[in-house]
Structure formats: C-alpha cells, structure tokens
Amino acid sequence: MSLAPTDYDFGEPSNYFFATTITCANEEARAMYVEAFGHMLNYNHEQAIACFSKVTELDPTCAMAWWGIAYCVSSNYNWSPGLGSGHDSIQQAVSLKAGCTELEQDLIDALAQRHSAEARDAADPSVLNMGNDPELNVAFAEAMEPLYR
C-alpha cells in the first residue's frame, strides 16, 4: 500500500539513507518507513504521520515508526490541533527501543526529552499553546548535541 504517488521525488537518496536501515521486522514496513521519512524531510508532516502510522500496523514493534510520529508532531511549526501531542508516541518508542541500534535508541531518548505528560496535558490550541515547552526544547537540543558531533 502506498499512501502517496509512487513517483514522488524525495530528493537525493543520500538524504534518507538512514531510513533504509532502521530496525524493522519486514520489508513492507521498511519501504513504508522510507516513504514516511521522505515526507517528514519535506515537511509534509500529516502525510508522514499517516505513513508512519501504517508502519506501526505492518510492524507494531518498529520503535522508529513511533519516533517518527512523535517527531512530526513536535517539529511541526504549522501544528494542527488534530495532530495531538507526541508524548504518547515517543513513550511507545521508548518501550520498544531495546532491540534497536544504538543510534536509534539515542534518537528515541533525545526526542523523549522534548515531551512530557504535563506539557501534553497543558496544551491548549485555542491560545496557541501546543504543549511545546521551551525548557523541553532545550533538553532535546542538549540530548541531540552528542549525536551531531
């Protein structure tokens, strides 16, 4: 199943090579993850979330699919109230990360720093509070720094 045109140009394959190597139980889920990752890189977050969600159906143990959902919600400056919080998705990724590569575990742990139940519960889209706490953003940035170096 493809949730988007199969000829969609995601740019240079080197931009999303990481996506082709994620820990995943089957190739159908991996192919959908690559599609989701491409949409994520192109800021097509709603389509990326739909594709990452399909990955969780194809492989419920794919921690990086849950990470992808949380990442799309947390990095989306055009956040829509219907997208919700990334807290529950990243907690699902945390619960599944044991079988992941070290890099995947580090990415999951870093993004988990950006979400809290308190921020999720305090979100109020009517006043543009999307549960995106500045202190949590700093914690995420600090957790990502060693991965960049």
What kind of region is each of these model predictions?
Residues 54-57, 95, 149:
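Conserved structural position within tetratricopeptide repeats
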